[in-house]
């Protein structure tokens, strides 16, 4: 039979889990922010018609749409 955890042990376990979840949340938020920045950069490039050729524009559009699709999932 598995012994029950003491209140102190439960609290330590909760604290460790909450800390790990907070770190994971911060990492996820940073990744989302990076994706937003990259998407905005690419969209800004698309708004400058002289700066990119048609094939480059198509590639940028494809990349932006792929990123948006990943974000929705």
From Swiss-Prot:
Q: What keywords are annotated for this sequence in UniProt?
A: Cytoplasm, Cytoskeleton, Nucleus
A Gene Ontology CC term for this entry? nucleus
Which top-level group of life is the source organism from? Eukaryota
* Keyword Nucleotidyltransferase found: no
The biological process GO terms on file are: attachment of meiotic spindle microtubules to kinetochore; chromosome segregation; positive regulation of mitotic cell cycle spindle assembly checkpoint; sister chromatid biorientation
Where does this protein reside within or beyond the cell? Nucleus; Cytoplasm, Cytoskeleton, Spindle
Q: Name one GO molecular function term.
A: protein-macromolecule adaptor activity
Q: Does the keyword Mitochondrion apply?
A: no
Q: How does it assemble?
A: Component of the aurora kinase complex composed of at least BIR1, BNL1, IPL1 and SLI15.
Q: What does this protein do?
A: Component of the aurora kinase complex, also called chromosomal passenger complex (CPC), essential for chromosome segregation and metaphase chromosome alignment. Mediates the SLI15-BIR1 interaction within the CPC.
Family indicated by similarity: Belongs to the borealin family.
Name of the featured protein: N-terminal-borealin-like protein
Q: Which organism is it from?
A: Saccharomyces cerevisiae (strain ATCC 204508 / S288c)
Lineage of producing organism? Eukaryota, Fungi, Dikarya, Ascomycota, Saccharomycotina
